[in-house]
Regions:
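Short, small/polar residue-rich loop motifs at catalytic or cofactor-binding pockets
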Residues: 158-161
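Radical SAM enzyme core and accessory elements
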Residues: 170-172, 181-184, 189, 213-290
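Flexible glycine/acidic-rich beta-alpha junction loops that bind and position SAM and/or redox cofactors
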Residues: 16-21, 77-113, 136-148, 180-185
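Radical SAM/AdoMet-radical enzyme domain recognition
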Residues: 1-98
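Generic recognition of stable, solvent-exposed alpha-helical segments in well-folded globular domains
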Residues: 33-36, 60, 64, 115-122, ...
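C-terminal accessory region of radical SAM enzymes
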Residues: 110-147, 178-222
Length: 290
């Protein structure tokens, strides 16, 4: 608290949702321990945010999910992360498929594009009427940032990436925490400095790939500016023209951007006029009542 640290807590909604997949190493539910940690942070006045994974199970209950964070936890900073993983039998013994592997099968817990789109739209409709400027949902804030031409603050919605490397316990450094595979290893902190690795040609190429590998369908899309193809790890589908590199969640993101476009346009006007984007709430209520 003294140093203004913001602590990220992994919690996937109410107990029923969280405990579906969040087990400890003994296979036991972890909800109560997570809540104990949250209550400890609250007791000492430490700012925290929720990092919530959206999966095949909890995605069907968007309002229960959101209202738990808002009404029960009074959590003002929320990150929603859609879980999309492919599984395969790699020669190195790993189960998760990297982007370079084409034979991975979608894991059963992965969210569908339709679920993701419905999840985001449903929560946005609740948020835009009541909570703008009070409860901050990272994806909504980042979408508005892209709408007004600012940096989105998260790599998945940026034009280029490569600034979020990860270090393992043994000092190995990888290009991204979604790409912890041998083929994306940059080196080890005991042999190279972070500066060397982060500004290496390999990492520069990795970051530029986010935009340079987009299929034509994305480049022609009216919402390309809003998502920039999202995270490269999810780009394992073929475009309508048969090009590789289409994001698995494309349909869901398109549904979301198309749904929120009028509200984002309004907030953009308010922002550029140096007024509060939260004014959208009154406008949204009037729009709904017409």
């Amino acid at each position: 608290r003294e140093n203004n640290f913001l602590v990220g807590i992994s919690i996937d909604g109410p107990q029923e949702f969280h405990d579906e997949y969040r087990k400890n190493k003994m296979g036991q539910p972890s909800f109560y321990k997570v809540m104990k940690g949250i209550n400890l942070l609250k007791k000492h006045g430490v700012e925290w945010n929720a990092m919530a994974v959206v999966n095949d199970y909890n995605a069907d209950y968007p309002l229960d999910f959101y209202r738990f964070f808002r009404d029960e936890l009074d959590c003002h900073y929320i990150q929603f992360t859609p879980i999309v993983e492919r599984l395969s039998n790699r020669a190195d013994g790993l189960r998760l498929s990297s982007l370079k592997q084409k034979d991975g099968e979608l894991a059963s817990f992965s969210i569908t594009p339709e679920q993701w789109g419905n999840f985001l739209c449903t929560i946005f409709d609740e948020w835009v009427l009541n909570d703008v400027g009070n409860y901050y949902i990272q994806l909504f804030d980042s979408t508005l940032a892209n709408w007004v031409g600012q940096q989105p603050g998260i790599c998945s919605l940026a034009k280029y990436c490569g600034h979020a490397a990860v270090m393992e316990f043994n000092g190995d450094v990888y290009a991204c925490d979604h790409f912890v595979f041998p083929e994306y290893k940059l080196g080890n902190i005991y042999q190279k400095t972070l500066v060397e690795m982060m500004y290496s040609k390999e990492q520069e190429t990795f970051g530029a790939m986010k935009h340079n590998s987009l299929p034509q369908q994305c480049l022609n899309c009216s919402y390309e500016f809003a998502c920039h193809g999202e995270c490269p790890k999810n780009r394992f589908m073929l475009s309508k023209d048969g090009e590789p590199g289409l994001n698995y969640l494309c349909k869901g993101y398109y549904q979301f951007f198309d749904h929120v476009a009028p509200y984002m346009d309004f907030m953009k006007k308010e922002y550029l006029a140096e007024r509060a984007p939260a004014n959208v709430m009154e406008w949204a209520r009037e729009r709904r009542n017409k």
